[in-house]
From Swiss-Prot:
Keywords: Repeat, Virulence
NCBIfam families: beta_rpt_yvtn
Domain PE as annotated: residue spans: 1-92
Protein name from the UniProt record: PE-PGRS family protein PE_PGRS17
A Pfam family hit: PGRS
Oligomer status and interactors: Interacts with human TLR2.
Function: Induces maturation and activation of human dendritic cells (DCs), via TLR2-dependent activation of ERK1/2, p38 MAPK, and NF-kappa-B signaling pathways, and enhances the ability of DCs to stimulate CD4(+) T cells. By activating DCs, could potentially contribute to the initiation of innate immune responses during tuberculosis infection and hence regulate the clinical course of tuberculosis.
Note: Elicits a strong B-cell humoral response among different clinical categories of both adult and child tuberculosis patients. Could be used in the serodiagnosis of tuberculosis.
Gene name for this UniProt entry: PE_PGRS17
Gene3D superfamilies assigned: HP0062-like domain (1.10.287.850), YVTN repeat-like/Quinoprotein amine dehydrogenase (2.130.10.10)
């Protein structure tokens, strides 16, 4: 007994490619049509004989090309019909087999939450949903769904005894989004004979980087995020701070004018105030996030302050002084 393995989609693709070849042949025939009647270059016998020879060859070419085109059309028709026939036969064969597979998987799925045979479902993109586990005996883990903005991608599903773990979903569109974890290798149920473990899927890539441009940016140095509101960017070259709306990633309002050479910036999780180090004026400016205006007078610290951080428990502010080799503490 002999068997033939056919992929109907590949047969249909081959038929389409063959049809394009036929189109190219017809184009070539049209271009060569003028060679069937070649005019003599002069009235002498030699020129007339050469023209007749070329014209004869052109006529023979057209005759052969017509036969090739006719054969090619029949070949494309046969290939297209074969693809359709194979597709119908495949669909007819798949239905009863799927019914048998459903009958086998139903009790296993009910008892273990996982089928015996079959691939796990992919997680829904934009939700960070984990991919489904593959079947106990055979099946690839589903891919994790991509995360929403700022959310990690979903973990890939585990493979069965035979199969590959699903790939982790990509993180949401934030530069620090965490990638989804890879799907676990397959393993046999307790008491079963273990087969070769499935290969864990690769973790998804981190989220894509979004570039924000604005006229107020002038040698931007530091950036800090207010957990309950805006993003603050220091512009060293213009002595200002730009405010970004994280919902739209666009600059909002006018730049906030502060000291000279603003460098570092930090937000207090205790008070919500924004602290900015002014490198050239040896001070720290404080911004009220509710009004986005400077509050009070600049606080004098050491020479050339750069870095700044806020203690999340006490609210104390720590400032590194680049040229003074000191650290200032603001209570």
């Amino acid at each position: 007994m002999s068997f033939v393995n056919v992929a109907p989609q590949l047969v249909s693709t081959a038929a389409a490619d063959a049809a394009r070849i036929g189109s190219a042949i017809n184009t070539a025939n049209t271009a060569a049509a003028a060679t069937t009647q070649v005019l003599a270059a002069a009235q002498d016998e030699v020129s007339t004989a050469i023209a007749a020879l070329f014209g004869s060859h052109g006529q023979h070419y057209q005759a052969i090309s017509a036969q090739v085109a006719a054969y090619q059309q029949r070949f494309v028709l046969a290939l297209s019909q074969a693809g359709s026939t194979y597709a119908v036969a495949e669909a007819a064969s798949a239905t009863p087999l799927q019914n048998v597979l459903d009958a086998i998987n139903a009790p296993v799925q009910s008892l273990t939450g996982r089928p015996l045979i079959g691939d796990g479902a992919n997680g829904i993109d934009g939700t960070g949903q984990a991919g489904g586990n593959g079947g106990w005996l055979w099946g690839n883990g589903g891919n994790g769904g991509s995360g929403a903005p700022g959310q990690a991608g979903g973990a890939g599903g585990a493979a069965g005894l035979i199969g590959n773990g699903g790939a982790g979903g990509t993180g949401g569109a934030v530069s620090l989004a965490r990638a989804g974890t890879a799907g676990g290798a397959g393993r046999g149920p307790v008491g079963g004979i273990g087969g070769a473990g499935g290969v864990g899927g690769a973790g998804g890539a981190a989220g894509a980087v979004t570039t924000i441009t604005h006229a107020s940016f002038n040698d931007p140095h530091g950036v800090a995020v207010n957990p309950g509101g805006n993003v603050y960017v220091t512009n060293f070259g213009s002595g200002t701070v730009s405010v970004i709306n994280p919902a739209t990633n666009t600059v909002t309002g006018s730049p906030i004018t502060i000291g000279n050479g603003p460098s570092g910036v930090a937000v207090s999780p205790v008070t919500g105030l924004v602290f900015v180090t002014n490198f050239d004026s040896n001070t720290v400016s404080v911004i009220d996030p509710t009004t986005n205006t400077v509050t009070g007078s600049p606080i004098t610290v050491g020479t050339a302050p750069t870095g700044v951080a806020v203690n999340p428990v006490t609210g104390e502010v720590y400032v590194t002084n680049f040229a003074g080799d000191t650290v200032s503490v603001i209570s």
